[in-house]
UniProtKB/Swiss-Prot annotation:
Lineage of origin: Eukaryota, Metazoa, Chordata, Craniata, Vertebrata
Protein name: Cyclin-J
Domain Cyclin N-terminal as annotated: residue spans: 15-143
GO molecular function terms attached to this record: cyclin-dependent protein serine/threonine kinase regulator activity
GO cellular component: cyclin-dependent protein kinase holoenzyme complex; cytoplasm; microtubule organizing center; nucleus
Classification via InterPro entries: Cyclin, Cyclin-like_dom, Cyclin-like_sf, Cyclin_C-dom, Cyclin_N
Amino acid sequence: MELEGLWWKGQLAVDIHQTLRYKELKLPSYKGQSPQLNLRRYFADLIAIVSNRFKLCPTARHLAVYLLDLFMDRYDISIQQLHIVALSCLLLASKFEDKEDRVPKLEQLNSLGCMTNMNLVLTKQNLLHMELLLLETFEWNLCLPTPAHFIEYYLSIAVHDTDLHDGWPMICLEKTKIYMAKYADYFLEVSLQDHMFLNYGPSLVAAACVAASRIILRLSPSWPTRLHRLTVYAWDILVPCIERLLIAHDNDVKEASKHKNHLSHTAAQCLFPPASPAPPQAHVQQHMPPYLQSQHHQLQFHHSAPQPQNCQPIITAAHASAFPLQTCASAIPTSIQARGHIQTTASVSLAAVPIEVKPCIGVSYNRSYQVNGHYSRLTQCFDR
C-alpha cells in the first residue's frame, strides 16, 4: 500500500476499503498448530526489529509476520530454517508493499546479529528457493489484508473536535490526533506479539486498536457513531479484542515501572553501596526476547508504550479503573498474567508434529528445495 500513497484520503477510499473487507473474508484459515508455536513470538520480534532497522512500512512488517504465521502453521521447520523463512517472508512482504530502495540487501541480512550468532549465511540461491517455496505455498497471492492495511482509514476520523476529553472539550485537537496515531501504532505492534489476535479479522483488530487508543486517551464516547458507521463494527463485537489489547498495555506499563524502580535502586546502590553485595537482578524486556538483547544496541529498536509530552495528562498505569469500558459486557480481569517470553537456543525441544502438519523442510538451512525446473533464472532483485 506504500506505493499507492494516501489512498484513505482519495475518492476511491470507500471502494478500496470495501475491496479489502471482501479479500479479508477469503483469507486462509489459521489453526495455530505449528510444532514451533513457542518460537513464534521470537520470530515476530525478529521481523519487527529488522523491518524497523531498514525503515520498512507497517504494512510490510505485518504482512511478513502473517506470511510467517501461515507458513509455520502448515510445516514442521527446524530452528535454523525458521531464520531463513522469517527473513524471506520479510523480503517478499517488503517487495510487495514497500519501495524498491527500501528492500534489504543480501549482505545486509547476512550481517545481522541473529545470523552471525547462528552461523547462518544466506546465498542468492537459497533465498530464491525459499521465496519460490513461499509463493507456491500461497499460490502466488500476497494480497492478504492485515490490520495495518485498515488502520489509516479508521484513523482518518478517529478524533473529531466534538469528542470530549475527561468530559471537557479538547484543548489541543492536533496533538490529540498525534497521540492517537502513536497509540494506534503501539497497539498494532502489540497485536503482532500474540497469535491469538489471528482469531479476529484484520479490520476488527484495526478498529479495536483505535478504540483502545481512545480509551487510553480518555476520549468520550469511546466508540462514536461515525466510527461505528465507517468500520461497521458495533462496540460489543470489539470488546473482547479491546480487552486483550488493554491487558497487554497494562503489562507493558508494569514492566516499565519495574525497570524504572530497578534503575533507581541501582543508582542508589552506586551512591550508597551496601555492606554485602546484593544479588544481581535480571530485567527481561516485555517485547524483546533474550536472544535478541545482545543485538539490541545495534538494531536500535524500542517497543514500549509511547509517552506523551506537553499536553493533557493522558497516560495512566491503571486505566482499567480510571476509565472502564462503558457498556462492556465483562470488565477487564483484575488478575493479569504476564505474557511469556521465549528462551530461544539451538537445542530447543519441539513438540510432536500434528497429523495435519507436513514435515517437509525440517532439514538444515542449506538444503536445495524441490521447485519446478523453469525457476532457473535469477530475477533482478537478487543482483544486489
